[in-house]
Amino acid sequence: MVRVMATGVFDLLHPGHIYFLNEARRLGDELVVVVARDSTAKRFKHQPITPEQSRVEMVSALKPVDRAVLGNEGDIFAILDTIRPDVIALGFDQAHDEARVRDECRRRGLPTRIVRLPRFEGDLDGTRKIIRRVGEYLAMEESLAKVEGRRGEEPSGRAG
């Protein structure tokens, strides 16, 4: 059985995440996803909007995922000793140095294959894009409210 490991923050799930996990799942028989701790996400990317426990629960519920676990605090490579993957799937935009990941696997006696997956070509394929789009939407609604004389209402009078 080929065990694939994929990692990520998975904050504000979007089509790019689903594509990444589907592609990772195709590389083997079992997909184990390591969800970054809040502290790790903050150190390497950004403060997550969604708490770590909620993120791991959401990822666990996704069809291609066999198991989702929270990563380790501090040493992000320590999880390799527990999961012992045959393949590590890296997203196109993940900053992990493939040579360093390979070295960490070798150091642990793991003959793990590292695969860099292609980019998802679609709209809203990143958390920052979603946040930016929401910001643009809210700014537009605020401008419309000022023009129309609305204040303190839900955008365009819609219930939230």
What do the predicted segments below correspond to?
Residues 1-160:
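Nucleotidyltransferase catalytic core that binds NTPs
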